[in-house]
Amino acid sequence: MIDRYKHQQLRIGLVSPQQISAWATKILPNGEIVGEVTKPYTFHYKTNKPEKDGLFCERIFGPIKSGICACGNYRVIGDEKEDPKFCEQCGVQFVDSRIRRYQMGYIKLACPVTHVWYLKRLPSYIANLLDKSLKELEGLVYCDYLNFSFARPITKKPTFLRLRGSFKYEIQSWKYSIPLFFTTQGFDTFRNREISTGAVAIREQLADLDLRIILENSLVEWKELGEEGPTGNEWEDRKVGRRKDFLVRRMELTKHFIRTNIEPEWMVLFLLPVLPPELRPIIQIDGGKLMSSDINELYRRVIYRNNTLTDLLTTSRSTPGELVMCQEKLVQEAVDTLLDNGIRGQPMKDGHNKVYKSFSDVIEGKEGRFRETLLGKRVDYSGRSVIVVGPSLSLHRCGLPREIAIELFQTFVIRGLIRQHLASNIGVAKNKIREKEPIVWEILQEVMQGHPVLLNRAPTLHRLGIQAFQPVLVEGRAICLHPLVCKGFNADFDGDQMAVHVPLSLEAQAEARLLMFSHMNLLSPAIGDPISVPTQDMLMGLYVLTSGNRRGICVNRYNPWNRRNYQTKKSDNNNYEYTKEPFFCNSYDAIGAYRQKRINLDSPLWLRWPLDQRVIASREIPIEVHYESLGIYYEIYGHYLIVKSIKKEILFLYIRTTVGHISLYREIEEAIQGFSHACSYGT
C-alpha cells in the first residue's frame, strides 16, 4: 500500500520479472508458494465461491470476508493466541479482506510477449533502440505470412545461414523459402540454432545491447551528419534531417534507460501481472444477474490461449511448428488486447457489439483512474460554481456566494458560536446556521477575514491555474472574479466553472499567503511577461469609456449633421439649435451631472484645470475668442480654453474632456496615490 509519508511521488515505468514475482508471490505458513493464476475461472456456478487458482482465488488474493476462509472457518484477526494463521484445508490465510485491494497475482506465459505500449505506440521504443523499422519488428513478433521475418541468433557460434550470408536483405528468396524449411517437423533443434522468431528474438537482441555504446555511436553519427551540410538535393536533405531527429530521440531514450537503471529486455514480458480482484470486481445486480469488469474477460482470454500453448509445447514432438507459431501469435494478440484494445486495428468486442475496456482505457483519459478517481475525486472543504466578473473587487479578492461560504466554513462558524457562548453544543450551532440568523453572518465574515481560499480552473496546465484569494461575501450563486486574473486561469465569463478549496493546515495557509496570492503572481513563470493585463471585456470597457470626439472642437460645432454629443433644445419652428457645452469647476460636479443624466458619458464638457504650461501651447492660434461685457474674454483652442482678464492675465484654464476620461483619470490617480502611500509606509 502507498504510505503518504514514505511515498512522495508516483511513477509508471518498466519493472523486472523478479520484481513482478516479488509483488505477486507469497509464502504460506506451511511453506507453499502461491501467486500464479493458472485457471481462467472466476466463481463456481453452484457454490458461488472463487475457483482455486482462478482469477478470484482466495489463496492468492486473500479472503473475501475478513477472518473467514473458503471452508467457512473463522479466526479473530490480530489475535496472537489464534493458531494456525491459515486454514490447512483450503490454504486461505485469516487476514483482513482489504488485502484483495492490493494483493497481485501473475500469469506465467508459455512464450515471451512484447509490451504493446513500447512496440506500437509512436515513437516505438523497441524500434528506436534496435534501429529497425516497425514493419520489420511486427513481422517478427506476429509471424504474419505476408510480412514474415526472422532474426539471426545472438549466439557467436558459426551457423549455416551466417556462413552463407543469407541474412542480407538483397537476397529476397529467404523470406519465403527459409521459414517453410524450418517449420518442417523434425527440424526443431536445427531451427533453434539457425534462426530466432517471435518476441524471443526481440528479447535476445535487446538483452545484447550495450546502451553506452549506442549512446556514443549515435552521438558520433549525429555529429558527422551535422558536419556534412546541405547537399542541394531536397529529398536527401529531408532524409538526413529525419535521421538526425531519430538519433536525437534514440540518445534521449538511451539516457533515460541508463539514468533509471532500466534494462531494455524488460519491454518483453515473461510474467504478466494480474490486478487485485477489488480493482476488477464482479457485482451482483437486481434479478441475480452478474456484472463483471471487462478486464476479467480479457484475462480469461489470455489464460485460455496460454494454457493451449503450454499443452502444445508439452507435446512438441507431435505438434507442427506452424501450429506453435500461430498459437504464440494468439497469445501475443491476447496480451495486446488486455493492455491496449484496438491498438493494432479492429478492437475486440463482446456479444452485444460493445468494445471491451482494456487496461489503457481504464487508466487514461478524462474518465480514467487517475483523472477521475485520484486527481479529480471530490474532497471535503471544496465547492464549485460558475464565475462572473467582479470589477469592483480588489485584485487579491474574490466574491464567494453565501450558500457556498457557509458550507465551506461551517466548522469554523460552529467553533465561533460555541466560543462566544452563543451555542451550547454543535447541534444548537447547526440549528442557528440552518435558520440563517444574523449573528451567523457576522461570525462568518470574521472567519473569512483571516482565511484565504484557493481557486482552481481545470485543466491546471501551469502554476497560475490555481491561485489564492481573500474571500468576501456576495449575493447570488456565482463566484465573482477580478477580470485581470482571467489570463492566468485561461478563463472567461461565458459559463466557465471554477473550484474553490479551503486550506486547513497552518502550512497550507502560509503557503497560500506567501506564494499563491493573485497580486503576487503578476508575471508569467514561463517567459516573465506580465500576465495580469486587460483583456476582452476590460479592453472594450476602456474603449467605450475613452471614446469621444478625437478631432477637437471643430468636428461637431460646425457640422449640423453631427451634433449628437451636444445638448440641443427645440425651438418654436421645430428646429434644433445648438446649446453651448457645459462648464464644471471640478470632476465631482461633472460626475454628479452624469449621474443625474444631465450629460452623457461621451458628452464633451469644459473642466477647470490648474494652470499648466504643458497644456498651453504658446504658438497655437485660438479658434474663437468670446468677449464679455465686463472685459473678460475667452480664447477657445482645440482641446482647452483660457479665461483672461482685461489686462490679459490668465484667470482660469479649462480643458475639453468627457466624463469617461475623467473617471479613468481619477481611477489612475487613486491607484498611484495608493501605491505611493504603500511604498512610503514600507520604507
Curated annotation (Swiss-Prot):
Q: Which UniProt keywords apply?
A: Chloroplast, DNA-directed RNA polymerase, Magnesium, Metal-binding, Nucleotidyltransferase, Plastid, Transcription, Transferase, Zinc
GO terms in the biological process aspect are:
DNA-templated transcription
EC top class named in words: transferase
What does the record say about how the cofactor binds? Binds 1 Mg(2+) ion per subunit. Binds 1 Zn(2+) ion per subunit.
Instruction: Quickly give the catalysed reaction.
Output: RNA(n) + a ribonucleoside 5'-triphosphate = RNA(n+1) + diphosphate
Query: Where, subcellularly, is it found?
Result: Plastid, Chloroplast
For activity, the cofactor(s) needed are: Mg(2+); Zn(2+)
Binding residues for Zn(2+): 69, 71, 87, 90
A GO molecular function assigned to this protein is: zinc ion binding
Predominant place of localization:
plastid
Q: How does it assemble?
A: In plastids the minimal PEP RNA polymerase catalytic core is composed of four subunits: alpha, beta, beta', and beta''. When a (nuclear-encoded) sigma factor is associated with the core the holoenzyme is formed, which can initiate transcription.
UniProt lists the family membership as follows: Belongs to the RNA polymerase beta' chain family. RpoC1 subfamily.
Kindly give the PANTHER family that the UniProt entry links to this protein.
DNA-DIRECTED RNA POLYMERASE, DNA-DIRECTED RNA POLYMERASE SUBUNIT BETA
Protein name per UniProt: DNA-directed RNA polymerase subunit beta'
Per the UniProt record, the source organism is Coffea arabica (Arabian coffee)
What gene codes for this chain? rpoC1
